[in-house]
Amino acid sequence: MNIVEKTDAEILAIAEPLWRDLVKYSNEGKYGEFARNFSSSLARAMDQVAAGHQFANSELARSLSPAIDTLGIIRRGEHVTVLYRQRSTKKPGEWLGRLVLGYEDGKVRIFGATLF
């Protein structure tokens, strides 16, 4: 099944635990756990040294609030993008979280995850 064929509720049931894991492992600085659900292409593209440096030196990456607001879902091709309002426990303001999901080898994987 193509993930774009799933209902919003089905997509969110998959996406929210993945996003919460990203927040948790980012806060804890655990890169291996953070990247465990990445697609093979995203995992290859991530530089572990740069990611480790980001975890160690970014106050935002280490202070993400577990409270999120889902803003919407965008379907395109074989992927869905779930948008979140993300906050920090230490920095004022809000960030846009973007989680791109799709299937790889029959399993839902993360093809992109960013904060703007």
Q: Where on the chain are the PLM-derived regions?
A:
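Short alpha-helical interface patches
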Residues: 8-12, 38-46
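Charged/polar, solvent-exposed surface patches and flexible loops
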Residues: 17, 24, 36, 53-57
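Short, well-ordered alpha-helical segments enriched in acidic and aromatic residues
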Residues: 27-41
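Short, charge-rich amphipathic alpha-helical segments embedded
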Residues: 43-55
